[in-house]
Regions:
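Multi-pass alpha-helical transmembrane bundle typical of ion/small-solute transporters
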Residues: 1-240
Length: 240
């Protein structure tokens, strides 16, 4: 009995670790996407608050998706809807970039309302979760384990998104890299729903996302570089 109980506990622990690892790996591209959504908000306080409220709603939607996962996977239309939503976000971002307002300074943030961003966060996370939730359900049939992994995944996502919000201000190409990542996830989701055998393996998608992130972090903002330089000069003068 003791050995049986110990074996069951080890099995549960390993399954939970697998779910947490799965959620963590799948959170990186999701996090940078959510960070890009809140970046237009005018203050860091509003950005953090929008992430908090948006992910609370997202957690509710994730749980609803988990509870109905066996039903949802029967309908490819859900994946198509999620894919089209992600592709719409990307198209909207680059369309606005191609049509700047002459009266708006080139580096200024577009106006977005706090309550407009929250549903965008929730539905974007839901679209990203369509793939990961079905994978998590395949790992184990213990619902409480999947829910625990889901909760840990949202906490991890919140932490990573907070980091990316700061990095989006520091690195010039990171926002475009974020939306190109959303584009790749949207295409994968669309292909999986329409023609699953043509979808590339996960490692190729991961490699592409890694390349996009590398490009995104390749150039720092000129303003931040100049600020760093001016902060170093007085220290050097003092040492001299």
């Amino acid at each position: 009995m003791t050995d049986l109980g110990l074996g069951s506990s080890i099995d549960i622990g390993l399954t939970l670790m697998a779910l947490v690892a799965l959620e963590t790996v799948l959170s990186a591209d999701n996090a940078v996407a959510l960070a890009a959504l809140v970046q237009p908000l005018p203050t860091p306080q509003q950005q953090q608050k929008a992430l908090n409220w948006g992910l609370v709603v997202a957690l509710v939607l994730r749980i609803a998706l988990l509870l109905t996962a066996t039903w949802v996977v029967q309908f490819w239309q859900f994946q198509v809807a999620g894919a089209l939503y992600l592709l719409w976000l990307v198209g909207k971002h680059f369309w606005l970039q191609l049509q700047p307002d002459p009266a708006t300074p080139p580096n200024s943030k577009p106006s977005s309302t706090f309550w407009h961003i929250i549903p965008l966060i929730a539905f974007t996370d839901l679209a990203f979760s369509l793939d990961s939730v079905t994978t998590a359900v395949a790992v184990t049939d213990r619902l409480w384990l999947v829910l625990t992994g889901c909760l840990i995944g949202v906490v991890t996502l919140r932490f990573l998104a907070g980091l990316f919000v700061r990095w989006l201000e520091e690195f010039v190409y990171l926002q475009d890299a974020a939306y190109l990542t959303i584009f790749s996830v949207g295409l994968k989701l669309l292909g999986k729903a329409i023609q699953p055998e043509l979808v590339p393996p996960d490692w190729t998608v991961l490699a592409m996302v890694t390349i996009l992130f590398t490009w995104g972090f390749s150039k720092r903002s000129v303003e931040l570089v100049s600020e760093d330089a001016t902060s170093i000069v007085p220290e050097q003068m003092h040492l001299d």
